Amino acid sequence: CAKFSNDNPNTTPDSHLLYSYFREFLDCGCKYVMMEASSEAFFRNRLETIQFDLSVYTNITSEHLNIHGTFENYVACKLCLFKQTKKDGTCVLNVDDPYYEQVKAACNGKVVTYGQDASATLQIVDYKVYPTHTLIHYKYRDEVIEVDSPLLGDFNVYNLAAGLLGALSVGVPLEQALSRIPNIKISGRLDLLTTNTPYYVMVDYAHTPNGITKLLNFVHTLDINRSIVVIGQAGERDSIKRPQVGEVVVKNASHAIFTYEDPRSEDPKDICNDIIKTIKDTYHNYEIVIDRREAIQKAIDMAEEKDIVLILGKGNETYQKLKTGTIYFNDEEEAYQAVANRKMREGVLN
């Protein structure tokens, strides 16, 4: 029970499996369960009987339309989390988000907020993002709190605020919550690899237009030259966003390499053609390399001093779902191997 890993392919498992996990946690003496409640889980009634003590809202962007049909249906499923929060529970909301009022109206429990707006329960006063850390000033109950966070990116200033306010809302003392922040590491999220090279390599889970845009905007605030992106789109999933991802990447990155990413039963070439559908006649800073291992190697081989290679879409996942079955594949391991291959060719020893 000291270490638990959910190897289930679903973000939120089916209800019978979920309850078996709860039983296991209870037998181990756990008092709290933190989980991600996906829109699909509400759509498929996996969470129908669960009431939440605490629910946290970050943002809503178009996603999973292959399941929900329309964006309105998607939002309706997202709101179920807050409707299923206990009356004596707490809803932690991003007050700066455009859908804040709609989410607030759905809340069954007490509402507390975070954001830059002066009305926020936990206000983001200011912050400065550095290449290795972020210095943040939050305001809580008229006290300004300085936080030195290992998490990078503007969006993580918000994510950390959400987590901190959530902890405070369930009774964790402020000093105890703050003491945990320096040790936070989120595998597969803004993972800057230790490559000992004049260029940088980062692995991240970003796979939606919004997530990719935020990531690339952050990366270009750093002292880098070119950004080289390796990314694909999943097969048998929301095909509407494929050309949107293509546009976002070529508009915000120096060069893009489109490749496969869990193609499942679809032809990876067809998926890549969907990605470039709206950019093929107007942009030329991209190429298609179907094999993901080859795509990663090509990106590494292209990198020059102060360039950054961004391998996106899978994060710390350890599989690829192909037509022939599921195979082991980890982007971080592949990146390290690609760097080693290049060093060997160039006679670099470290």
List each model region and its residues.
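Structural beta-sheet core signal
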Residues: 35, 55, 93, 113, ...
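Acidic, Mg2+-coordinating active-site environments of NTP-dependent enzymes
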Residues: 28, 43, 51-201, 224, ...
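ATP-dependent carboxylate-amine ligase
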Residues: 108, 162-174, 179, 184-185, ...
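Conserved nucleotide-sensing/catalytic segment adjacent to the nucleotide-binding pocket
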Residues: 6-38
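Conserved acidic residues
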Residues: 31, 53, 89, 254-256, ...
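Short gly/ser/thr-rich secondary-structure transition/capping motifs
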Residues: 13-16, 35-41, 72-76, 182-186, ...
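Short beta-strand-centered segment that lines the nucleotide-binding/catalytic pocket of NTP-utilizing
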Residues: 1-3
